[in-house]
Amino acid sequence: VVHVVFVAPRFLENTNRYVRAFAELDDVTLTVVSADPEAAIPAPLRPRVAGHYQVADPLDGGQLTTAVRAISRGIGPVDRLAGALEQLQLPMAEVRDALGIDGLRVATARNFRDKDRMKAVLRQAGVPVAASALARSPAELRAFVDRVGYPVIVKPPAGLGSRA
């Protein structure tokens, strides 16, 4: 039996689909970490969830580490740590590194969470990528546009759109 801890910041409809998918797997013990209380777990899923640990901020690697450590003591060793949100990948990697859980590590998570770093890694591997620059000011952005021309796409280095 594989013990999976799923990080569900909130028990929203889309997140519940992932919780349900893990809950329906044979030979999986499922525990969830969430900012929501245990009562927020949808009633049909509760019988398949072995445990719940509530944290104030599921995006905080320290809080997740504390939660997973407590889950390991209370329910048993954790084999996998999963979560659907892109923003969870770095804090979950911090937990894996801290507790020796198999899966994506911090260095790798940073490679795909930070767009500038990701492009540098791809370039080093010989993968062609579009010209890019980490512009920290309007002047740096103008200099990049002067060098490469239009069109350009401007994105934050990490995060979703304008919510970096």
Residue ranges and their predicted role:
Residues 111-130, 137, 144:
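Glycine-/Pro-rich loop/turn segments that contact NAD(P) or position catalytic residues
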Residues 44, 144-145:
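Short glycine-biased active-site loop of nucleotidyltransferases that positions the nucleotide triphosphate
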Residues 102, 125, 158-161:
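A short, flexible beta-alpha/helix-coil linker loop
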Residues 131-132, 151-164:
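Glycine-rich phosphate-binding loop of ATP-grasp-fold ATP-dependent ligases
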Residues 146-150:
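Nucleotide-sugar donor-binding and catalytic loop/hinge architecture
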Residues 1-108, 113, 117, 139:
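ATP-binding N-terminal substructure of ATP-dependent carboxylate-amine bond-forming enzymes
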Residues 51-53, 110, 130-134, 164:
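Structural signal for short hydrophobic segments within the conserved structured cores
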